[in-house]
Amino acid sequence: MLARNDDTSSYLLVKPVTKKEIYSNDLENGNVKRGASTHSLYLIGDPKFCRNNSSKQKSIIILCGPTASGKSYLGHELAKAYNGEIINIDSMQVYKEIPIITASPPKSYKTEILYHLYNFLSMTEDFSVIKYLKLATEKIKEITDRGKLPILIGGTGLYINSLVFGYNNIPDISEDLREQVRNLHAKIGNIELWGKLEKLDPLAASKINQNDTQRLIRAYEVFMQTNKSIFSFQTLPKEQILPDFNFKIIFLNPERKFLYKTCDERLDKIFKEGAIDEIALIKKQFAPKDYTNWKAVGIKEILAYLNGNLTLDEALNAAQIRTRQYAKRQVTWFKNQIQDKITLEYTNQEEFTQTLKKPFKTI
């Protein structure tokens, strides 16, 4: 496993060294074969990485990366090694009705480590980045006040970007207006709503695809609430969330062929271990308007199976394809949008799991 600091393009062991030096040193010591990846997370350089008492700034770890990359396992091991607690930073794992389809951490993990902001919200409740930031900052401060290390795990780029770099403070949308806009969309659909947006806010319409339902509705309701384009708020200074904290971002970046394999295997396991029954239950509990915007991969495909539009194999295959596409977008986003990060690269499961068996001595 390679640990790369993206600021310096160097690979980190006990001290920053070049990739060439890593292979040279390890070959001399007999640790690795030529061309093999280097060892493990415990060799990542900064001794103060996880120690909240070593400086005035308190540390926060953010463990990010594509779906099915091993974030939950790695985060759990870090929490055990460094007296940490886990905070969710995934927009779908907040919902209590769908722990299986969203691959939320297993109950066995939660008996060992405290987990926060997982599976607590009803699918019928509105949630937003602003609401997430409020809850997450409260949990971060509670955890550090207890002398523990906050470890945030997830793949929702908007949440991560807003927490680390700040956010544009768009006024809250009233519940009445939100309901009106959603009812309007249900009645007229994307194309006609986009046409209305174009007349009111041509800037937003020029930047939003007609098929992007979530962004389309959001832009329309923001204009109706504020009489301003949603994009006008992006020119304002961002409001910093946690200026007194030091963020350490670890990006898991598996080799693509291996990542796609783990995506397929995860979906297959999820389908076999209760996802069908889970989605069948919420299909009975909620009206269709309540779940049309649910974005978790697999929900739409399982609904199509339950409605008789796809066979089970077809639904699984469709969900696997969409998961791989989503994972690819996540990798691209994290590579391009988060510059100050440590990147962990690995090519197979054995390399990932074996390297993590060593102690995390110098993180």
UniProtKB/Swiss-Prot annotation:
Residues that bind ATP: G65, P66, T67, A68, S69, G70, K71, S72
Name of the gene encoding the protein in the UniProt record: miaA
Family: Belongs to the IPP transferase family.
Record field: catalytic activity: adenosine(37) in tRNA + dimethylallyl diphosphate = N(6)-dimethylallyladenosine(37) in tRNA + diphosphate
InterPro entries: Dimethylallyltransferase, IPT, P-loop_NTPase
Disulfide bonds: none
EC code(s) of this entry: 2.5.1.75
Single GO term (MF): ATP binding
GO terms (BP aspect): tRNA modification
Organism: Rickettsia massiliae (strain Mtu5)
Entry keywords, A to Z: ATP-binding, Magnesium, Nucleotide-binding, Transferase, tRNA processing
Functional summary from the UniProt entry: Catalyzes the transfer of a dimethylallyl group onto the adenine at position 37 in tRNAs that read codons beginning with uridine, leading to the formation of N6-(dimethylallyl)adenosine (i(6)A).
Oligomeric form and interacting partners: Monomer.
Cofactor: Mg(2+)
Region feature (Interaction with substrate tRNA): 90-93, 214-218
Protein's name according to its UniProt entry: tRNA dimethylallyltransferase
Annotated substrate binding sites: T67, A68, S69, G70, K71, S72
Annotated positions for site Interaction with substrate tRNA: T156, R178
